[in-house]
Amino acid sequence: MEAPKILVVDDESRMRKLVKDFLEKKNFHVLEAGDGEEAMDIFYKEKDIALLILDVMMPKMDGWEVCREIRKNSKVPIIMLTARGDERDELLGFELGVDEYISKPFSPKILVARVEAILR
């Protein structure tokens, strides 16, 4: 069985690497995007992405817009992983269709556990 593909979208390369390292330890296949436009390109090119981990504040296209676009024609699970921990932001995320909302700073082990739970 092929490892599930997870697209990690964050404009900070250190954050992408941290998340990628923890996910790869659990045998997930991780793709990375540094902004929303790149994320959309990868999402439409790779037809079998199992889950997205998405930052909100990014250049070119923010996480809210990526979520709106993806939800137009996909129910792929989305985890928002963002420094925007305000209640309004979290509620907006759920309104737009995210499956989980995690505020930074976060526990990488808890993030991986949530990914595994969503994909179970």
Residue locations for each model-derived region?
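Acidic, metal-coordinating helix/loop segments flanking the phosphotransfer/catalytic sites
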Residues: 7, 32-51
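Active-site residues of response regulator receiver
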Residues: 10, 55, 82
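Charged docking surfaces used in two-component/phosphorelay signaling
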Residues: 17-25
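Acidic catalytic/metal-coordinating carboxylates
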Residues: 35-38, 62-65, 89
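Short amphipathic alpha-helix used as the core "switch/output" element in two-component signaling
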Residues: 41, 64-75
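Receiver (REC) domain active-site loop signature in two-component systems and cognate sites
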Residues: 58
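C-terminal output helix
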Residues: 105-119
